[in-house]
Amino acid sequence: MGAMWMKSMLLVLLLCMLMVTPMTGARSDNSGPWMWCDPEMGHKVSPLTRCRALVKLECVGNRVPEDVLRDCCQEVANISNEWCRCGDLGSMLRSVYAALGVGGGPEEVFPGCQKDVMKLLVAGVPALCNVPIPNEAAGTRGVCYWSASTDT
């Protein structure tokens, strides 16, 4: 009876290991400090209303009033988890595109403002505001990681 019990336990342990290994492998790609930026994990995405105003003014070449810059920088600094700052800025950019009906092409967001220019301006807000972000684009300081992607 002892040998049969040992074989059964060994088989159960082996099955458990086979089940757990793929689950932990899949989770490891998505785990890290950035996982707390997911709204499903309780993160409240900041609307960054003053940053919207700043980027719109900058994109068409208008001077940005000091209070708009200060307020935008404060909004970004108020995102307590540094890992979430670029995610919230990306979310803001996508919502601006959606509100203006901008598609996936290289068109203007609004007269005088090209989509790729707006994207780079938004990605550079942390550098402009001198707020730290741990997930910078390769070879840059203060520029969000998604600035070089074609998705945003």
Swiss-Prot record:
Residues 1-30 form the signal peptide. InterPro entries: Allergen/amylase_inhib_rice (IPR002411), Allergen/soft/tryp_amyl_inhib (IPR006106), Allergen/tryp_amyl_inhib_CS (IPR006105), Bifun_inhib/LTP/seed_sf (IPR036312), Bifunc_inhib/LTP/seed_store (IPR016140). It comes from the Eukaryota. Its main location: secreted. Keywords: Alpha-amylase inhibitor, Disulfide bond, Secreted, Signal. One of its GO terms (cellular component) is extracellular region. Five disulfide bonds, which are essential for the inhibitor activity, are probably present. CDD domains: AAI_SS. The keyword DNA-binding does not apply. Belongs to the protease inhibitor I6 (cereal trypsin/alpha-amylase inhibitor) family. This is Alpha-amylase inhibitor BDAI-1. It comes from Hordeum vulgare. The lineage of its organism: Eukaryota, Viridiplantae, Streptophyta, Embryophyta, Tracheophyta. The gene is IAD1.
